[in-house]
């Protein structure tokens, strides 16, 4: 009869994740100024962006100079979706806008990544740099989408409120970002434990051997 063995319960890992959640929950209650709230929200966004880049460079060993392109393009899609909600042409809840931006970023990454991943090493880095410069040049030409030098602004207090949450108070925006930050960090960690995540480590350490596997 076949028996299954499970990994031992990792107490330290649960402690770290619990502390991470506690910090996210209580940070705005400790740092209560408007500046602190803005900085905490931006830190949550930066955590997601930096850890995703760590998967690319730290786990896969691929130096990219165009990683911010996908974050930026996804953000522009999200702000256009927010303006559509404000105009009444869309009924998407504001709380789902980060998902829209995230999936838009994935779409652009698949489209541009199909070209950039044809090479590796220094050629890969130079291609990603070229993609970043191309998108920068496009931002000046397509002002309808990018908003030109002024960018695009929106009103986050739009659409129907859910459970009385309007995202008018800054703390509500922070907790929305904190929830997405925790979920994204957990998903990225889980990805590194999958076979595909392990293959990224192998590609980083010995790409020639991986080609023969």
Language model features with spans:
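Transmembrane alpha-helices and adjacent helix-loop boundaries
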Residues: 1-213
């Amino acid at each position: 009869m076949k028996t299954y063995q499970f990994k031992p319960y990792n107490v330290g890992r649960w402690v770290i994740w619990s502390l991470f959640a506690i910090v996210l929950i209580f940070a705005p209650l400790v740092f209560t100024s408007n500046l602190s709230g803005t900085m905490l929200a931006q830190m949550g966004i930066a955590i997601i962006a930096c850890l995703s880049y760590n998967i690319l460079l730290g786990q896969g060993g691929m130096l990219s100079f165009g990683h911010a392109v996908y974050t930026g393009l996804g953000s522009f899609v999200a702000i256009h979706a927010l303006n559509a909600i404000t105009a009444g042409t869309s009924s998407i809840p504001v709380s789902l806008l980060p998902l829209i931006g995230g999936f838009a970023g994935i779409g652009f990454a698949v489209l541009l990544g199909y070209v950039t991943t044809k090479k590796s090493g220094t050629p890969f880095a130079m291609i990603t740099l070229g993609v970043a410069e191309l998108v920068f040049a496009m931002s000046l030409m397509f002002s309808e989408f990018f908003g030109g030098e002024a960018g695009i602004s929106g009103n986050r207090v739009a659409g129907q409120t859910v459970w009385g949450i309007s995202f008018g108070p800054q703390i509500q925006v922070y907790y929305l970002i904190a929830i997405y930050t925790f979920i994204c960090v957990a998903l990225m960690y889980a990805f590194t434990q999958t076979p595909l995540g392990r293959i990224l480590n192998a590609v980083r350490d010995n790409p020639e051997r991986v080609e023969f596997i």
